[in-house]
Regions:
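Short, glycine/acidic-enriched loop or turn micro-motifs at the edges of active sites
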Residues: 56-58, 79, 107, 168-170, ...
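Active-site micro-motifs of SAM-dependent methyltransferase domains
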Residues: 24, 107, 151
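S-adenosyl-L-methionine
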Residues: 1-148, 154-158, 207-237
């Protein structure tokens, strides 16, 4: 049985987490963990929102989105982290996420993509591992499911996002490129964690060009922070 303990993320957001996550020192340091980004999300997400959380990792931030009143669609390719989700959702008295997608949000679709509506994927039955690493699209895109956000909305009838959060370690343009129709039609708010070095290394792409492309779709940009990555917020102009 996983030990769940109370944590206060960035000195502000209280929730129950598996002990190894609650014990992360970054939550309690003055600079916090992605503090301006999380504060911006808290200020702009609430009841009636549908958040597509791309790169959900172990689930703290999307769980907070749901605690603030939003519905969430989770994208996470790493099978080793899904076991954290039921423990966190149950301990915080949350309803099941609207949709779980154990794969990559991408700019293409493969035959491995799976969608679970109001249920957990089978990956949740694995043992919780504290050290799990990441899955990266450019290396393992053919190993795990890929689906576009546009396909989620227009082919599968999932509620369109009012907000998209993505932290994908270099594959930012793959995600947003696969959401172009949704971005043009619905103008969801976007929290983008940009990794310029990874984008260049993995895809020979420029974060600057992605930023200009996004603004060209009718968005205004706010730079929230730059720590280990640059945190950007976009809203309809």
């Amino acid at each position: 049985m996983t030990e769940m303990v109370k944590a206060v993320l960035n000195g502000e957001f209280e929730m129950m987490l598996p002990k190894h996550r609650a014990d992360r020192p970054e939550w309690y340091e003055q600079q916090g963990w992605e503090k301006p980004r999380l504060k911006s999300m808290h200020q702009n997400i609430g009841k009636g929102d549908v958040v597509y959380y791309v790169g959900a990792e172990e689930g703290e931030f999307p769980a907070l989105c749901q605690m603030w009143g939003a519905e969430v669609v989770l994208f996470e390719p790493n099978p080793k982290v899904w076991s954290h989700f039921p423990a966190t959702w149950t301990a915080n008295n949350l309803e099941l996420p609207m949709v779980c997608i154990p794969g990559f949000a991408s700019d293409k679709i493969n035959d491995l993509s799976r969608i679970y509506y109001n249920e957990w994927p089978p990956e949740v039955n694995d043992v919780i591992e504290a050290a799990h690493g990441f899955k990266e699209l450019y290396l393992e895109g053919d190993t795990y499911g890929q689906i576009t956000i546009d396909s989620c909305v227009y082919d599968h009838g999932i509620k369109p996002p009012t907000a998209i959060s993505l932290d994908v370690e270099g594959s930012e343009w793959r995600v947003l490129g696969g959401a172009e129709r949704v971005l043009r039609e619905y103008k969801p708010k976007i929290w983008l964690s940009g990794h310029p070095e990874f984008m260049l290394q993995q895809w020979d792409e420029s974060l600057y060009n992605l930023r200009q492309w996004t603004k060209g779709l009718g968005y205004t940009e706010t730079i929230l922070d730059y720590q280990h990555e640059v945190h950007l917020y976009y809203e309809s102009a």
